[in-house]
Amino acid sequence: MEQNISINEVMQAGQEKQLYRVLWVSSDQEYGYWISLEKQTRVPEKFICQEVIENISVGEVVVVEDPIRVYERNVAESAKERRDEWWRILKPILECEPDIYERRRRGELLSETAKKSNKNKANLYRYLVKYWKKGKTPNAFLPDFRNCGRGAKTQNQKKLGRPV
């Protein structure tokens, strides 16, 4: 049975059991690019498909369910507008696969886009990485509010400080 590696598949690999998202695979399944979902790295890594398939067959690499889901429900209209703006700006360079995964070419593409869109190159790169890590969908550009706020803890009713 011939196994293929699919785009957007999430795999757990290595001794540290790191999660990786497959970003692109060549048409002949020779090589591809993936990015770590857990490390702070922002650079896609090249991999050899045959090695990954062999590691899957021996259990060193496991295909897992996608831990990052981005939904559109309960999203403010302003957030949708911001998402659409970033999608419009980055879409031309996102279509330049596999060039976008090579460091030098990615820098050139981002510089050109920064000049055209009047946006900061660092911000473009930040949104590009966000797009890769969150599943290569336009909804990846939505604001990430799930980690904001205090949480469900109640405040202490007793006032702090010296008694009056």
Q: Which residues does each predicted region cover?
A:
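Secondary-structure boundary/capping micro-motif
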Residues: 1-164
